[in-house]
């Protein structure tokens, strides 16, 4: 949509696979765990979810929504088993694929009005942080539209101007 008004955004899709798994001897208290390799996991109800956030140079092809089970078998599971011994015996329950809208400039959201096109507001490029930030961003953008300014949160630092000037 931004391209329709001539706005070139540094945002592209990045494919992410989330694996849902269970184990016999569940760790009693398991926090969000992120291994230096990018493999991560956390509790999700009675099961666990996990995956890998690879380096940008190792990103999987994002033109499909195919689940890479080999990635789970060869990378995710062995890394989790090394980090959390109870995960040596995991059972994969299901998996899904989605895309992040990844901001290649600075991995932060692009928020607020377009400086020249009236009634055009940005709220994209969250780079995987959208779910966590959406309540605050929704409120801030609503204030901006209703009152012409941010009131509860000043999010000007995430404005389109930094993108136009290529300033992370």
Please state what every model-predicted region is.
Residues 18-20:
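Sec-dependent N-terminal signal peptides of Gram-negative outer-membrane/periplasmic proteins
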Residues 78-168:
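C-terminal catalytic lobe of FAD-dependent flavoproteins
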Residues 9-15:
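Short hydrophobic/aromatic-enriched beta-strand-loop microsegments
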Residues 15, 36-37, 127:
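Short acidic/glycine-enriched loop/turn segments that link adjacent beta-strands
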Residues 1-7:
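Flavin (primarily FAD) binding-site architecture
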Residues 8, 22-119:
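Active-site lid/adjacent beta-loop-alpha segment flanking the redox-cofactor pocket in flavoenzymes
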Residues 15-16, 158:
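Short linear loop/turn motifs
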């Amino acid at each position: 949509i931004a391209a329709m008004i001539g706005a070139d955004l540094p945002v592209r899709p990045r494919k992410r696979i989330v694996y849902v798994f269970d184990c016999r001897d569940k760790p009693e208290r398991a926090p969000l765990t992120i291994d230096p390799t990018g493999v991560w996991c956390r509790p999700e109800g009675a099961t666990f979810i996990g995956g890998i956030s690879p380096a940008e140079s190792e990103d999987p092809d994002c033109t499909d929504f195919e689940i890479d089970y080999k990635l789970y078998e060869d990378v995710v599971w062995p890394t989790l088993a090394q980090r959390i011994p109870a995960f040596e015996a995991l059972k994969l329950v299901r998996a899904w694929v989605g895309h992040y809208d990844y901001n290649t400039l600075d991995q932060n959201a692009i928020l607020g009005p377009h400086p020249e096109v009236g009634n055009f507001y940005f709220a994209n490029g969250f780079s995987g942080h959208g779910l966590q930030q959406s309540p605050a961003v929704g409120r801030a953008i609503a204030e901006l539209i209703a009152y012409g300014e941010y009131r509860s949160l000043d999010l000007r630092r995430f404005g389109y101007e930094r993108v136009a000037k290529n300033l992370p």
